[in-house]
Amino acid sequence: GASEKFHGAVIDHYGGDDTRVFKEVTEVGEALVKLQEVCGSQMKAPAAVLYDRENNWAIQDVQGPRNENMFYTEAVQKQYRALREQGLNVDVISMEHDLSDYKIVAAPMAYMFLDGYEKQLRTFAENGGTLVLTYWSGLVDGTDKCLLGGTPYGLMEAVGLRTEEIDALYDWEENFGIPENGNHLGITGTYTCKNLCELVKVSDAEVLMRYGKDFYAGRPVLTHKAYGKGHVYYVCADMEQAFY
């Protein structure tokens, strides 16, 4: 009786087992039995994107180079979306996560390096992984104290460059990247960058794109270095989604 007296059920008011619903539910049960070996199994993602909460807090707390918004979350989302659009399963991980099972790791704006994290990233690339780093990486330790000796800390050899300074753009300002002719990624178009543009000094990295204007026109905006058995890419600016 009451409001649910005509609510759908496996067995209706007729009470028999020769109804369509009963038969279809039975078929579902039989199919689930056949899937017992699959139940509990996992699909290992080949790619991961670093999103670390403590890193986010540290970026939010820093005074400069932009006081309004550093767009850390958006930087993570851009790389996550790019990997998903390639049909890859992607894990979102913190700095405590082991990297050895991945083929690709993107660590955008890894401003804070917990103790030994730079070694973990180096080892990942040395062992054959593809590592994507960006501007504003490896500046402070786990207590938010500046790391000395150059940035990205502990990774300058791996990326083949050292960061020198960073240009904070107003919200209405833009720059753009121009691809090098014959670059191995086959990049042909120009791409807009906003908010943060890092200036780097290349040692032995391959320059794939350069800034198109301002006082740093012609300086690298995208680099690559073969490191160990793997590859390290460094994105020097906050590039638009289409770039990825």
For each feature predicted by the language model, list its residue ranges.
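Carbohydrate-binding surfaces of carbohydrate-active enzymes
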Residues: G1-Y244
